[in-house]
């Protein structure tokens, strides 16, 4: 039995639906409401730390068809503050499924709403930009008008993502090592779905600003021993680990308040060790070389974003998840733009001309989405190999 639920945006836009997650009356969740156009991958989206403090609207109408499983998580918990969908199927079916989407949300105490007009909501967000919002489960002692007013007040209390340093909130507390490679279908019941890299060739230190596990798997699959370190790790501590290369991960929030990371990256750039950044790591690399970042109106969230590699002129379909971008006109002379969005011409990749350091705004590791940009991992490994030789 699903309880009634409402979604109210900070501007007062109101939607009525049913609660498909955590069911307690008077429960609520607040965050920045964004929309994602991916047709699949809802479990990966929910567990992506980049969605911390965000309520995710999935524009594809049928969500939950394949249930959830124990292998598709991108972290050890759900980081999205809430989920908004149009229709939740009554049945789920997939040979890997261990739970329904609703049961998965309830298990993790995540508030979610279904049966609302997600097309109307998406149009509002496109026209006004991302807004704070609140999913609220009314109680029987309050009128609907009272519930809406309360939810709007809660939404307004969230404020803006600008100025929020969320990397410190989602990062690991202690460094750890990673050896697990990419997923594959086991050939028998005793097989393991993930390869273990037992004879690594390179040592990469990865900053965890909210790192997705498939990024680590892509590096491990290419022969890397990965040491994952907390976001506030100093450059001196990084160098003490004697890495062959340095990776700057994805993550949530505004990059500008992450001054600790920007300072460390600046120092690491002086070492000539290869550096590769993704998403938030891309923005932090830009800030470290003197560029500026800015908040986007509604960001890029989806698995079908066309991006052009300016060197090869190839068009790549990419997975995207970010609400901030590098201001191209603030880039210094020693930085070139390598990739550009074909949706809005925003900067999607940069590279330093005087050392081995480059980054990409989207997600070459996908999960969910295409792997057209996975070659950037190979580029990083080739740079590590050349530097080590």
From Swiss-Prot:
Protein keywords: Amino-acid biosynthesis, Arginine biosynthesis, ATP-binding, Glutamine amidotransferase, Ligase, Nucleotide-binding, Pyrimidine biosynthesis
E.C. number: 6.3.5.5
Pathway(s): Amino-acid biosynthesis; L-arginine biosynthesis; carbamoyl phosphate from bicarbonate: step 1/1; Pyrimidine metabolism; UMP biosynthesis via de novo pathway; (S)-dihydroorotate from bicarbonate: step 1/3
GO biological process, one term: 'de novo' pyrimidine nucleobase biosynthetic process
PROSITE patterns associated with the record: GATASE_TYPE_1
Reaction(s) catalysed by this chain's protein: hydrogencarbonate + L-glutamine + 2 ATP + H2O = carbamoyl phosphate + L-glutamate + 2 ADP + phosphate + 2 H(+)
Region (CPSase): 1-199
Keyword Ligase: yes
Recorded superkingdom: Bacteria
Top EC class, one word: ligase
Domain Glutamine amidotransferase type-1 residues, every copy: 203-389
Pfam family membership, one: GATase
A single MF term (Gene Ontology): carbamoyl-phosphate synthase (glutamine-hydrolyzing) activity
Gene3D superfamilies (UniProt xref): 3.40.50.880, Carbamoyl-phosphate synthase small subunit, N-terminal domain
Residues at the catalytic site: 279, 363, 365
UniProt keyword annotation of Nucleotide-binding present: yes
Binding positions (L-glutamine): 50, 251, 253, 280, 283, 321, 323-324
Binding partners and assembly: Composed of two chains; the small (or glutamine) chain promotes the hydrolysis of glutamine to ammonia, which is used by the large (or ammonia) chain to synthesize carbamoyl phosphate. Tetramer of heterodimers (alpha,beta)4.
Family: Belongs to the CarA family.
Protein name from the UniProt record: Carbamoyl phosphate synthase small chain
Organism: Haemophilus ducreyi (strain 35000HP / ATCC 700724)
């Amino acid at each position: 039995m699903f309880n009634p639920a409402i979604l109210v945006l900070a501007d007062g836009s109101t939607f009525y639906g049913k609660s498909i997650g955590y069911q307690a009356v008077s429960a609520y969740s607040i965050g920045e409401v964004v929309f994602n156009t991916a047709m699949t991958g809802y479990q990966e989206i929910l567990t992506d730390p980049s969605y911390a403090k965000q309520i995710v609207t999935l524009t594809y109408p049928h969500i939950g068809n394949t249930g959830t499983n124990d292998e598709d998580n991108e972290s050890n918990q759900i980081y999205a503050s809430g989920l908004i969908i149009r229709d939740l199927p009554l049945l789920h079916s997939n040979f890997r499924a261990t739970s329904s989407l609703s049961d998965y949300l309830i298990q993790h105490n995540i508030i979610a709403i279904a049966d609302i007009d997600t097309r109307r909501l998406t149009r509002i967000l496109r026209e006004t930009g991302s807004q704070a919002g609140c999913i609220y489960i009314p109680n029987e002692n309050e009128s609907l008008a009272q519930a809406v007013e309360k939810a709007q007040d809660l939404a307004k209390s969230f404020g803006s993502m600008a100025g929020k340093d969320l990397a410190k909130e989602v990062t690991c507390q202690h460094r750890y090592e990673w050896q697990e490679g990419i997923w594959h279908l086991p050939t028998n019941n005793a097989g393991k779905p993930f390869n273990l890299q037992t004879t690594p060739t390179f040592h990469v230190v990865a900053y965890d600003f909210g790192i997705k596990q498939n990024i680590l798997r892509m590096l491990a699959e290419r022969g890397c021993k990965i040491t994952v370190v907390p976001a506030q790790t100093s450059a001196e501590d990084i160098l003490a680990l004697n890495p062959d290369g340095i990776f700057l991960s994805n993550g949530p929030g505004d990059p500008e308040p992450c001054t600790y990371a920007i300072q460390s990256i600046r120092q690491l750039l002086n070492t000539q060790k290869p550096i590769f950044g993704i998403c938030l790591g891309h923005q932090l690399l830009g800030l470290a070389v003197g560029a500026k970042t800015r908040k986007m109106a509604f960001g890029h969230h989806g698995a079908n974003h066309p991006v052009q590699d300016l060197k090869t002129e190839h068009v790549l379909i990419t997975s995207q998840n970010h609400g901030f971008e590098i201001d191209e006109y603030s880039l210094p002379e020693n930085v070139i733009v390598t990739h550009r969005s074909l949706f809005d011409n925003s900067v999607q990749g940069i590279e330093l001309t005087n050392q081995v350091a480059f980054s990409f705004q989207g997600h070459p590791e996908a999960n969910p989405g295409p792997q057209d940009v996975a070659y950037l991992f190979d580029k990083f490994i080739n740079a590590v190999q050349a530097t080590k030789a």
